Amino acid sequence: MASTALSSAIVSTSFLRRQQTPISLRSLPFANTQSLFGLKSSTARGGRVTAMATYKVKFITPEGEQEVECEEDVYVLDAAEEAGLDLPYSCRAGSCSSCAGKVVSGSIDQSDQSFLDDEQMSEGYVLTCVAYPTSDVVIETHKEEAIM
């Protein structure tokens, strides 16, 4: 009687390198996917990527007109400074009038400010240091004397 032994072969794949394929925007090799696609990544929301609105903000200054792009969650003064504009400001908290401007067209959210009264806001005055764009907007700058 002949007996045969069956042997089983064990193959280990632990030595093989696993290549990952990009599965999220963060894993793409671009330096700044936010500016590339107009997206914002937030780790506070579990790493989700959300679309952010970007608006054109035109500043009418004593030196002329200049236009910058501003995301909906960025103060217009900050966007102006990032673009190299030199606009007046002092407190950066919406509690003085150094950065005052006047909205010519468009709309802004300045709910963070505590200086302007309802009448001044209804006339279009804005504190650029605490104003978010909610549409494309045109703002005349250097209006501190007009509200005093």
Swiss-Prot record:
Q: Name one GO molecular function term.
A: metal ion binding
Give the 2Fe-2S ferredoxin-type domain ranges: 55-145
**What is the top-level taxon of the source organism?**
Eukaryota
Q: Which Pfam families match?
A: Fer2 (PF00111)
> How cofactor binds (record note)?
Binds 1 [2Fe-2S] cluster.
Tissue expression pattern:
Expressed in leaves. Not detected in roots.
Entry's CDD domains? fer2
Disulfide cysteine pairs (residue numbers)? none
Q: Which GO terms describe its biological process?
A: electron transport chain
Subcellular localization is given as:
Plastid, Chloroplast
User: Mind listing the UniProt keywords for this protein, alphabetically?
Assistant: 2Fe-2S, Chloroplast, Electron transport, Iron, Iron-sulfur, Metal-binding, Plastid, Transit peptide, Transport
Question: What coarse category fits the chief subcellular location reported for this protein?
Answer: plastid
Task: Detail which positions bind [2Fe-2S] cluster.
Answer: 91, 96, 99, 129
Which InterPro entries does the UniProt record give?
Answer: 2Fe-2S_ferredoxin-like_sf, 2Fe-2S_ferredoxin-type, 2Fe2S_fd_BS, Beta-grasp_dom_sf, Fd_pln
GO cellular-component term (any): chloroplast stroma
* Xref: Gene3D superfamilies: 3.10.20.30
Where does the transit peptide start and end? 1-52
Q: Which family does it belong to?
A: Belongs to the 2Fe2S plant-type ferredoxin family.
Biological role stated in the UniProt entry: Ferredoxins are iron-sulfur proteins that transfer electrons in a wide variety of metabolic reactions.
Name this protein carries in UniProt:
Ferredoxin-1, chloroplastic
- What organism does this protein naturally occur in? Arabidopsis thaliana
